[in-house]
């Protein structure tokens, strides 16, 4: 499989990792009246890409290049993810990705990552094994950070899929910029708003999405 095909496969929303059950905070943002339509959705996606997307991609890129050991990457992710609910969501998605990765690349030392690794840590290892360039691996993570929330908003607000897709096209350049920034070094930031949304969502009774 070529690196381009790997990139497209990892970015495919149909990838069976369980990511489709996570909204990235958009469900709670909609419930709070923060996201009501396309304009506010775009603003939310920009913020999420610039914070969570950058953070996840930067840790994955460091693991990918071998600059950050698995245990260190796990601690760095925890330190930048204050909300327990957000950490749980990250580890849940990491577990989904590692389950698939074990089947694609067996006998690749997955035990080292433990039973519930963060998504960024698994993605870094997957990127290295698949032959992707670190910047492409970072781009795929930034991209799915955006599209996961965009698709969830489309469903929750009954938005026109074409109009939501236009928004994601308009943010494509931003995604590339953030991916480049992520490969330059570890991002040292968190987003109190996204952490608050994650924690509130975790306390919600019968939400439609896991996070």
Swiss-Prot record:
<comment type="similarity">
    <text>Belongs to the UreF family.</text>
</comment>
<dbReference type="GO" id="GO:0005737">
    <property type="term" value="C:cytoplasm"/>
</dbReference>
<comment type="subunit">
    <text>UreD, UreF and UreG form a complex that acts as a GTP-hydrolysis-dependent molecular chaperone, activating the urease apoprotein by helping to assemble the nickel containing metallocenter of UreC. The UreE protein probably delivers the nickel.</text>
</comment>
<dbReference type="GO" id="GO:0016151">
    <property type="term" value="F:nickel cation binding"/>
</dbReference>
<protein>
    <recommendedName>
        <fullName>Urease accessory protein UreF</fullName>
    </recommendedName>
</protein>
<keyword id="KW-0996">Nickel insertion</keyword>
<feature type="region of interest" description="Disordered">
    <location>
        <begin position="71"/>
        <end position="93"/>
    </location>
</feature>
<keyword id="KW-0963">Cytoplasm</keyword>
<dbReference type="InterPro" id="IPR038277">
    <property type="entry name" value="UreF_sf"/>
</dbReference>
<dbReference type="InterPro" id="IPR002639">
    <property type="entry name" value="UreF"/>
</dbReference>
<keyword id="KW-0143">Chaperone</keyword>
<comment type="function">
    <text>Required for maturation of urease via the functional incorporation of the urease nickel metallocenter.</text>
</comment>
<dbReference type="Pfam" id="PF01730">
    <property type="entry name" value="UreF"/>
</dbReference>
